[in-house]
Regions:
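Rhodanese-like catalytic fold shared by cysteine-dependent sulfurtransferases
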Residues: 1-11, 17-49, 58-84
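Short, surface-exposed ligand- or partner-binding patches at beta-edge/loop junctions that are enriched
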Residues: 53
Length: 84
C-alpha cells in the first residue's frame, strides 16, 4: 500500500459506492463510482496506468476489463481495500 500511495505517476481509481468510501480511501485515490465509469472515460489518458480498487477486488476486476477493452492501461488491485 505504501508504494501505491507514494507513486504520483499512478492513477488510483476507487470505484466503491459513496457509502463505502466514507470508511476511508487510499491517499491520492480518485473516487469514481463503478456505474459512472463510462461517463468519465473522457478524463482517462491513454498510456498511463490506472489501478482500479473496490472493496474486495470483484467489481474492480470487471472495470479493469472494461477499461482494457477500451485500450487503457488498467490493473485490478487484487483483494481490494480488504487486502489492506
Amino acid at each position: 500500500m505504501q508504494k501505491m500511495e507514494s507513486d504520483e505517476s499512478m492513477h488510483i481509481i476507487d470505484i466503491r459506492e459513496d457509502y463505502e468510501v466514507q470508511t476511508g480511501m487510499l491517499k491520492g485515490a480518485e473516487h469514481i463510482p463503478m456505474q459512472t465509469i463510462p461517463d468519465h472515460m473522457h478524463t482517462f489518458r491513454q498510456n498511463e496506468p490506472y489501478y482500479i480498487i473496490c472493496a474486495h477486488g470483484v467489481r474492480s476486476e470487471k472495470v479493469t476489463g472494461y477499461l482494457r477493452d477500451h485500450d487503457f492501461e488498467a490493473y485490478n488491485v487484487t483483494g481490494g481495500m480488504a487486502a489492506f
